Amino acid sequence: MPPLQNLADSLPPYANDIALNLGSVVAETILTEPQKWGCFVASAHAVAVPRVVKAIEAAADAAGLAPDAKLAARGAAAIMAQNNVYFRAIAIMKNHQDYRALRARLRMRIVSNPGVPKDDFDLWCVAVSAINGCGDCLDAHEGALRSRGVEPVVAQTAMRIAAVVQAVSRVVAGEAAAA
């Protein structure tokens, strides 16, 4: 964890809880290692704070995340950046039923063929959708996990990782802006 320990150690005192939470989610054993590090990579790319992305990518490499899994996690962040905006917009529109009846007409082949186990990819989509606040996408990907027998604590762990990565990223970005 050295790259992430360095990141945690660099957080200001007001973010001590966040630094401790980072250590906790790194040590988490509920997810497989690829699932966990894919959640970190997808979440980092969703927030896109360069220093955090670099630290998480280095930690994922050190933990042995396979290159194809890393690319799929980045792909989850990319496709959810598109889908979360589209489906969240429809969900908050007053006349959303009219729009729900229309085909999205957006390519999203990576969702059906991510190149990694579906459970892993859906977890990464849950993490990114939590960051981006898309309830419909959270429901869709969490529902897919449940339909395959994945326990709720697994999705919860992905959301915890996403929450911590988001918080670390906001602190790092805020401190850089204030400097």
Regions found by a protein language model. Give the residues of each.
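Hydrophobic alpha-helical segments
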Residues: 1-179
